[in-house]
């Protein structure tokens, strides 16, 4: 089942590492005879999860295959919702999740009421998942998310993290699924539908710059606007839902022709894993991630957020013992709630 979802870049990374193993000195080859193959779930193409997930998989495979026999493959998915399901079904070993899904799955909230996922463990906070409620400029009335009412609007793929987080935000602002004429499209599908004027807007949350949003801003003759959240709206979202939101400003110039800052909101993205992954493996994954910062920064601008200082921010579930070991070595003070129970 896993291999059906394996994408070419993850495959190429694994092939590259396997070739490197074949040509290494025999002593090193013997050291890596025991192979650990892992799968990390990302999301659809056009956002940030997929390129960053592929980047992490490639980094880990390149850094850890020779000496430790660890190889990692990145797969696409419908996003956080499917990623939680795949972790529950033990189809994947690692996953990128929105903070909303990590918190809800661990605590048994919302969709996961009466069925919490207590086998997930936190590794690190990654980067902010920034809300991009984008609409055609001629559909703008107030400039905030209430403008999506009545529009033919892409909520994201059915069952995706995009759909769930968007509906959660909408519920806090007095809207629901019936408030829009819903379409269920991936990121690039949404941008294409907006360019073709088949829909009036879309929810495309990711770390900026988001490829699908850049595509919209760069299209000649097309005028779009990313809607802004008021302080009151952010307060309502945090007070009435499990969405762990905070203010985020998309700086002017992030997108082609963007002349002003955009005041939106964000939630943390998380790297989590199954408790079944060994302590030594997770320790090595965590160590490689933080000791090679330039690698992921070259993949995407959001790689700059992956730092030791940010590592424990917004984590909903206890740390995996392997990650805990690394952070203790670095002298981090670990909150009691993040210390795994033995």
Describe the residue ranges of each PLM region.
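A structural signal for short loop-to-beta-strand junctions that line the ligand-binding cleft
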Residues: 114-126, 131-132, 253-262
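Ligand-binding clefts/hinges and TM-proximal coupling segments of bilobed small-molecule sensing domains
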Residues: 150-168, 241-315
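N-terminal (or domain-start) structured segment
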Residues: 32-104
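Bilobed "Venus flytrap"/periplasmic-binding protein-like clamshell domains
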Residues: 37-63, 73, 129-196, 313, ...
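Acidic, polar ligand-binding/catalytic clefts
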Residues: 92-127, 207-212
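Pocket-lining segment of extracytoplasmic ligand-binding domains
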Residues: 99-101, 109-111, 137-139, 176-272, ...
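An extracytoplasmic/periplasmic, membrane-proximal ligand-sensing/linker region
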Residues: 189, 206-226, 238-239, 280-342
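Short, low-complexity disordered leader/linker segments with a strong preference
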Residues: 1-36, 341-342
């Amino acid at each position: 089942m896993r291999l059906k979802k394996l994408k070419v870049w993850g495959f190429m990374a694994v092939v590259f590492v396997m070739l490197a193993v074949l040509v290494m000195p025999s002593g090193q080859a013997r050291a890596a005879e025991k192979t650990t193959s892992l799968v990390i779930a990302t999301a659809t193409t056009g956002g940030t999860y997929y390129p960053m997930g592929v980047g992490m998989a490639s980094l880990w495979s390149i850094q850890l295959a020779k000496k430790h026999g660890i190889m990692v493959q990145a797969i696409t998915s419908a996003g956080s919702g499917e990623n939680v399901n795949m972790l529950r079904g033990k189809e994947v070993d690692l996953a990128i999740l929105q903070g909303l899904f990590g918190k809800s799955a661990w605590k048994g909230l919302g969709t996961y009421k009466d069925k919490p996922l207590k086998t997930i463990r936190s590794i690190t906070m990654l980067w902010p998942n920034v809300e991009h409620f984008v609409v055609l400029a001629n559909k703008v009335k107030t400039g905030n998310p209430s403008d999506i009412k009545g529009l033919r609007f892409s909520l994201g793929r059915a069952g995706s993290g995009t759909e769930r987080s968007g509906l959660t935000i909408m519920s806090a602002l007095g809207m629901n699924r019936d408030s829009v004429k819903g379409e269920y499209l991936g990121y690039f599908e949404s941008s294409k539908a907006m360019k073709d004027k088949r829909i009036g807007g879309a929810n495309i949350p990711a770390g900026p710059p988001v490829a699908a949003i850049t595509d919209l801003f760069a299209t000649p003759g097309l005028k779009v606007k990313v809607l802004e959240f008021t302080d009151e709206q952010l307060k309502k979202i945090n007070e009435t839902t499990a969405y762990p939101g905070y203010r985020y400003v998309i700086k002017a110039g992030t997108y082609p022709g963007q002349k002003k800052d955009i005041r939106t909101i964000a939630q943390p993205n998380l790297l989590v894993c199954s408790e079944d992954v060994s302590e030594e493996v997770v320790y090595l994954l965590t160590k490689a991630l933080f000791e090679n910062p330039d690698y992921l920064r070259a993949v995407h601008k959001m790689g700059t957020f992956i730092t030791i200082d940010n590592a424990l921010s917004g984590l909903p579930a206890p740390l995996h013992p392997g990650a805990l070991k690394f952070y203790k070595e670095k002298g981090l003070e670990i909150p009691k709630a993040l210390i795994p129970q033995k």
